[in-house]
Design a protein with these regions (language model features):
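Auxiliary tRNA-acceptor-end handling modules of aminoacyl-tRNA synthetases
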Residues: 2, 6, 10-80, 126
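Alpha-helix boundary/N-cap detector
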Residues: 3-6, 10-13, 33-36, 40, ...
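TRNA-binding/sensing appendages of the translation machinery
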Residues: 49-141, 149-150, 179, 199-200, ...
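Positively charged, Gly/Ser-enriched RNA/tRNA-binding surfaces
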Residues: 80-95, 106-109, 140-214, 225, ...
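Short low-complexity, flexible loop/linker segments enriched in glycine and/or proline
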Residues: 114-118, 233-235, 344-346
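Acidic, His- and aromatic-enriched active-site or binding-groove loops in soluble protein domains
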Residues: 121-128, 236-257
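Retroelement reverse transcriptase polymerase core
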Residues: 210, 215-216, 229, 235-239
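Glycine- and charge-enriched loop/helix tracts that form the active or gating conduit
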Residues: 218-228
């Protein structure tokens, strides 16, 4: 049994290496004759893995399971999901948004180059009739493509979209991390006064999470102009800014020492430059941090930093009117890995968002328990151990002024500026479902019901029965 498991794990590793080789070929736009043999090798490994995964005893039998990263939803879960979707949609429509729908798969060239390092998570489909297609990774890029195709009619629109997206991620099911999952997006496209739509999107985010009764949460806010300016004044080469930004974005999951190691050892950044970056990106606070950065003589020599700080100051003024500034944290470590963001960026987190402490994980790994053995089996099978990850952000978004222009070919890349927010509905659902299960364990009843109940109220007059009344009857 052990040797069979080792063979499966080895085959999985070979497949990952082969996939990396194919991604590198695609990234370098290698000719088809160079890609074909590598693709054939991957298919051969896939067949080999299938044969190894089926024991002689079970050969010919169908394994009843859902694909990795997907699941079925039982009646109670569906009742809760229906409530969550209805609540989110109610908030979106209250702000005047209309809904659209787009194909579940797009032309591969539409999605290519929009997600930075996350592009490797896109599901590519086999060639069908000469068109190379991929499953949509999010709802933002399809929306930008939609606006670019209909600029006259929909160049100025508040839109929401609730639909499934697909990512080749390492799933952690109980943490709301799937390969097939719903996103609930609210976006504003068009030209408005500075920071007005940005403030409304943040207000929508807060109102939605409050309406879902998610509990305590914090909205981390940053600005790509400020972040890029920090990298510039610290001496990061232009061609490394996006990869260094992706490393910084991991500070919510990893300590600074690990992030610095990645920047220096893996990304090739000079250690002195990484240290300078660390003095900035480990800062967080409120409006007072804006004033502090405006007083930084080195940073304010960069024009983009001055613009970004002025926009952040204006954003806080609008959010004061909405009454949500107490939920915000100006966090310079927030980077958002997607390449299309150009301005304000934000994400909402809860106490469950962060992964368990390294200390707890270490003690679990050394206790020799059955739980530890299961973790080791999961590692051998290339699976993610759910006990080592948090829920992650429960909502995120930002400004992406150039995305529509990338599709429309306009001479002005920011001809249709956009800003939006996406609610991580699966992660919200996992938190709410855990709450229901805890209530059931205590013998309490949840307000979420699997069956609809219709209540009829009938008003009946009060008749005082007397002997005369009885005779009349």
């Amino acid at each position: 049994m052990s040797s069979s498991r080792e063979a499966v794990a080895a085959c999985r590793r070979q497949m990952e290496a082969q996939l990396d080789k194919l991604r590198a070929l695609n990234a370098s736009e290698a000719p088809a004759e160079a890609v074909a043999p590598e693709l054939a090798a991957l298919q051969s490994l896939s067949t080999q893995l299938s044969e190894l995964s089926v024991s002689k005893k079970n050969k010919g039998k169908i394994t009843l399971k859902t694909p990795k990263g997907t699941r079925d939803w039982e009646p109670l879960a569906m009742a809760l999901r229906k409530h969550v979707f209805a609540t989110i949609e109610r908030v979106f429509t209250t702000h005047g948004a209309v809904t659209i729908d787009t194909p579940v798969f797009e032309l591969k060239e539409i999605l290519a180059g929009k997600y930075g390092e996350d592009s490797k998570l896109i599901y590519d489909l086999q060639d069908q009739g000469g068109e190379l297609c991929s499953l949509r990774y999010d709802l933002t890029v399809p929306f930008a493509r939609f606006v670019a195709m209909n600029p006259t009619e929909y160049g100025n629109i508040k839109r929401y979209h609730i639909a499934k997206v697909y990512r080749r991620d390492q799933p952690a099911m109980t943490k709301g991390r799937f390969r097939e999952f719903y996103q609930c997006d609210f976006d504003i496209a068009g030209s408005y006064d500075a920071m007005v739509p940005d403030a409304e999107c943040l207000c929508v985010l807060v109102e939605t999470l409050d309406a879902l009764d998610i509990g305590s949460f914090t909205v981390k806010v940053n600005h790509r102009k400020i972040l890029d300016a920090i990298f510039a004044v610290c001496g990061v080469p232009e061609d490394k800014i996006r990869t260094i930004s992706s490393a910084v974005d991991k500070l919510d999951k990893s300590p600074w020492a690990d992030v610095k190691h990645e920047m220096v050892e893996e990304k090739g950044l000079e250690e002195s430059v990484a240290d300078q970056i660390g003095t900035y990106v480990q800062q967080r606070g409120g409006r007072e941090l804006i004033a502090k950065l405006q007083g930084d003589a080195v940073l304010t020599q960069n024009e983009r930093a001055v613009e970004g700080l002025a926009e952040m100051e204006l954003l806080y003024q609008y959010l004061d009117v909405y009454g949500v500034t107490d939920r915000l944290s100006f966090d310079l470590s927030l980077a958002r890995g997607l390449d299309y963001y150009t301005g304000v960026i934000y994400e909402a987190v809860t106490a469950l968002s962060a992964p368990p402490s390294m200390t707890a994980a270490s003690s679990d790994n050394n206790d020799g328990s059955e739980k530890t053995k299961k973790k080791n089996v999961a590692a051998e099978n290339g699976e993610l151990d759910e006990s080592t990850v948090g829920v992650g952000s429960i909502a995120a978004g930002g400004r992406y002024d150039h995305l529509v222009g990338m599709f429309s070919g306009s001479k002005r890349p920011d001809a249709v500026p956009c800003v939006g927010v996406s609610i991580g509905v699966e992660r919200v659902f996992s938190i709410l479902m855990q709450r229901i299960q805890e209530m059931q364990a205590r013998g309490e009843r949840s307000s979420v019901r699997q069956k609809e109940v219709e209540v009829f109220v009938l008003s009946m007059g009060c008749l005082l029965y007397t002997s005369d009344a009885a005779d009349e009857r």
